[in-house]
C-alpha cells in the first residue's frame, strides 16, 4: 500500500473550499479524527472500525451532540443473543452460519483483559457449528475470568 498523503487532501480542500472532502485510511484514534476535521469535512474509519468497533461508542455524542447513552459492550452482547436466536429460529442451525454474525463481533472487546479468549470462543468452529446463541455468554464469561 502506498504511503498515505493527508497533506494532499488538505491542499485539495484549501484549493477547492466549496468541495466536500472526506478522508479515509489509517485513522485509528479520536485525536487523529479531530486533527483531520480541522482541515477537512469528514473522516471515515475503515479497518479500525471493523477491528475495534467500540472505538465509535462515543462518536454520536462527541461529533453530533447526541446525549443519549451509548450501549456498553455488555449491553451489546445482551441484545445480540435474542438477535441470534431469532436468526436461528428463522433460518435453522443448518441454514445460518453463526460465524456470519459472530465474525463481526470479534473486535468488540479489543483492549480488554480476556479479549483473546473472547475471540477464540467466537471463532471455535465446533461451537459455531452447534448453532447456539449462548456462545456469546460463554465468550463473555472468558472476559470475566480474565479480569
What residue ranges belong to the model's regions?
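Alpha/beta catalytic cores of nucleotide-metabolism and tRNA/nucleoside-modifying enzymes
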Residues: 3-23, 27-147
